Each structure stands twice: as C-alpha cells, then as structure tokens.
Amino acid sequence: MAASARVSGHDRGRDSRSRLIRLGLGASIAGLTAVLMVAAFPPGRFPEAAYILAIPGLLWSRRRPEWRLFLGFLFLGLFTGWVVLIWWLHHVTWVGMIGMSGVVALFPLVWFAAARFAMPRLAELEVATRITAVLGLAGLWVVLEWARMHLFSGFPWLPLAASQWERPILLQSAAFTGFWGISFILIFFNLGLALYLVRLVGFVRRRNGRFCPEFYLALVFLFLGSFGLYRTATGQKREPLMRAGVTQPYIPQVIKWDPSEARSILDTIYRTTLNLKALEPTVMFWPEAVTPLAVLGNASMQGWVETVSRDLDAPIVLGGIAFSEDDGGAELWHNSVFLVKPDTGLSPVFYSKRHLVPFGEYIPLRRFFPWAAKFVPIGGDFTPGDTSGLLSVNLPERTLSLGSLICYEDVYPALARRTTLDGAALLYVATNNAWYGEGAAAYQHAAHSVLRAVENRRPVLRTGNGGWSGWIDEYGLIRNVLVNDEESIYFRGGSVFELDRDRRWIGRLSFYTRHGDWFVLLSFVLAVTGAVLLVRRPYDPLAEVRSTK
C-alpha cells in the first residue's frame, strides 16, 4: 500500500512537472510570436521578422499539443502583438483598441488552427500532395486577410505584406498579384523553413533525412517575387511631374473643431503655406479636413481658401468638409478633397470619401443605437461618395488627373484600383493622424500607400496634418519624407517635393489594376484543395517517424 502511494505521488509529481513544461513552452511561443509581430511591422525596423513570424507556432503544432493549450497561448501571443501594434488607438478609445486587437487576432488564429491540423499529417503524404497541402495553407492565409478586409466593414490594417514597405525589392509582385502575392510568398517561406527545420532536426538525431522540396520551392517563390520581378523597375525613363508643396499644419485634435480656435487655425495654415511661396510650388497640398469650417457650403470659408490660392499664385488641393441639402431639406455632409485655382476659385468638381469610418464618421444602424452619437465628433452622419471624383490639375506642360483617397481609404486596394482605372495619373492621400498621437499609426498608415503605389504603378503623394507626409514612386521607393531637424515626422512645417514619374507607365495599367483580386480566388482554390487532400486521409501518428528513416 505504501509503495503504491509512493508511485502514485511520483506520477503526480511527474505529471505536474510535465504540465509546467507544456505551459512554459506555450508561454514562450506566445511571447516569441508577439515579439516577431511587433518587430516585423512599422515602426519596427526588422521586416525580416516576417519571414519567421509563424515558425514558433508551426514547429509547436508538429508536437501535437493539446488544442486548448495551443489555441489559448497562440491567441494570447497574437492578441498581445496586436495590442502593441495598434496601441495608438487608445487615444480615441481604450475599449475599441482592446476589442479590435481581439477580433483581428482571431483571423491568424484560424490559420494556426488549420496548421495544427495539417502539420502532423504532412509527413504521410506523397511529395506532390504534400506540396499542394502546404500551398493550400499559404492560400488560406491570403483568404483570411481578404476576409478581414470585408467582414463588418473591414479592418485590413497591416497585412503581412505591409511589413516589407521599406523593402521595394520584394514589392514588385504586387503589380501582378496585388499585395496578396507578397503575403503568400512570406507565409509560404515560413512554412517551407519550418518543414526544413523539422527535417534538419531529424537528420541531426538520426543522421538521415529526406529532401525538403517545400523549402526549395519557397526559395524559388522568393526569388521570382523579388529579383525575378525587380528587373521591371530597371531601365526607367523618368520625367518631371510637378513641384508639390506640402503643408503640414499639425493642428491638435482637441482644438480642431473648437469655434474659438478657428482664427488661430486659419492663421497657422496661412503662414505655413505662404512660407513655401519662395520655393515656387506648382501645386500646394493640404491634409484632410484642414479648415475648421466647411469649404463648400460656407461662403466665408470658401472665400478665405480662394484668397490663399491667389496670394500663393498656385492651385491648392485640400481636404475639407462639403455641406449641402438634398431636395427634402435634409443636411448632407461629405468628407471631401477640393481643388482651388488662383484664377477661377473653387472647382465645382470635388471628391467625397467613399469608405467611411464606422462610429467615427457615421453610426451604423443609428436608429437602433442612438446612444452612440456621443462618439461621433460631428452631430450627424457623413454621406459617402460614390465616384472617384478625379480632379483636373493644370500644370505648365500638361493637365494631370489626380485621384484622391481620404484618411484610411488607402488601406483598401479596391478604392485605389478603381481610381486608377478611372484615369488617375497620381494618387493623393489626404489624412489626419493627429487623432492617434505621435506613435506608430502614421508609419503603419504610410506602409499601405507604398503597396497601393506598386499595385497600380502610380506615384502616391501623402499629406498628413501632423505626419507622415511624403511621396512614393511607382515601384514602392519612398522618395521624400517631411521631417524636422530631429528627423521626426511630427511637427508643423512644410516643404516642396520634386515629383517625377516613369514615362513607361503613362496611360498604362498594371496587371493587377486590370484584373483585380484574381490571386485571392486562386488562393481560395488552393486552400480548398489542400483541405480536401488532408481530410481525406486518416491521421497516422507513426508516419512522421517513418518519414525520417
């Protein structure tokens, strides 16, 4: 009896230690996943972390951990990573920041759940079937990024491809596949490297192992998506486009809509703008909703903007509010971009934002949630636009079709693509990131503009109220960024950028612009095919052991 009790106690102690080891491993995987996420995306300076971001979770999945343990710790890691990445959102809403982090963490968690199911089963598959299954996992990642873009109005912030925003050599595939292709290459490399490491461990332990075709296929994809396509960026024939003046007034959000501060705000805009007159800008650009009163619908505000354009002796492209009434007398508010010319004044053609921010610019189902009105800074809902609203900007040697995107519209590739299809030669992003403090938000936001430039082979010019202001060429190269003497983007000032373009893309459309999100459909087919191949075969736990012999 005593011996039995001692054995039982020993077993309990061993089980307890084993449990602690599993918990420690799970916590380590969660922490490492969060660290790699934060390092990979701006303002992190280690985009190469995206090549190994999923590997801790993938290697863990090969050990067949308990489902609850696996999903629980990976959710913790993904959630923590997102909290750090969108920490800036707490300036607007703590609840929204925490809730959004949890929601967006669910999408990669679904992918890791699929990997937990697939990874132990890959060993029992023939080479062709195994490669197809791995391609299916990579395709599933793309499908989940697409779903995150569309569900519940969408929050496509920081897809995996955005990690490479300062690595133009890998971005060129976006002109063919959209940013989806970049995400596919990166996650497939994670899968290939993870499987290679598994084989390597098997070789070290048993001095034998098999060829890992998935890893070498990942290298092929990486080469084709980078060096193989980078040649498209060589042999450029660049020509001057314009001298773009950029005004960054850096109006604090707490006073932006305060009527008592209106005169001070206008004086700041005027001084910051006219300080650039000696640099002879061809066109001046102001950020989103820059004026404290509506530009359209307020005669005095319109007159003031027209006066500034005449004093500057140059056209001004500015973000502002448009106010009007419909036939029934109901108020209509638009978040818009206008063109003001020194000779003719405010152009009747303007762009209105098409994708509004829920609970920021309108309240979904307002009649069911009237209490939510306190979260909207302007009393009523904004009305979305429904066209690209191209602005015809007269330059000394040509008339330029300018396509506008407001605030976070540049995170939606379909909007930039539609604007380019309608004839835009230059994409302009007017934004106001002052809502989110001086953290990572502006850098992360700019990363999406880089993707839009490459996808559509159009230069992108950005002006922010407080940063990030600059321009990106058709190949994703960041050509200029407005910074102060301390190299900070967060300041009040302005500059004039010499914009140019590659003549080879004048009037031409990229493959992606012409054909859209075809790669998402391909990824869906791969994901379904891979799932069918895995589900059809029962799991053999001894297959992995046999595969290394």
Question: Where do the model's predicted regions map?
Answer:
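Solvent-exposed, acidic/flexible segments
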Residues: L25, I29, V104, D258, ...
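Solvent-exposed soluble domains appended to multi-pass membrane proteins
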Residues: W286-T548
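Short, conserved active-site loops that position catalytic residues or coordinate cofactors/metal ions
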Residues: F41-G57, Q248-Y250, E280-A294, A430-N432
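Short glycine/proline-enriched turns and hinge-like loops at secondary-structure junctions
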Residues: L151-G154, R238, G328-L332
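Generic structural signal for well-ordered alpha-helices
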Residues: W111, A115, Y270-T273, S388, ...
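Membrane-embedded alpha-helical bundles of multi-pass enzymes
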Residues: A2-T232, G437-E438, S449-A453, G464-G466, ...
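Glycine-rich, flexible loop/turn motifs
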Residues: R148-A161, L170-Q172, Q253, S347, ...
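Membrane-interface segments at or immediately adjacent to transmembrane helices
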Residues: E166-Q172, L219-W286, L296-E306
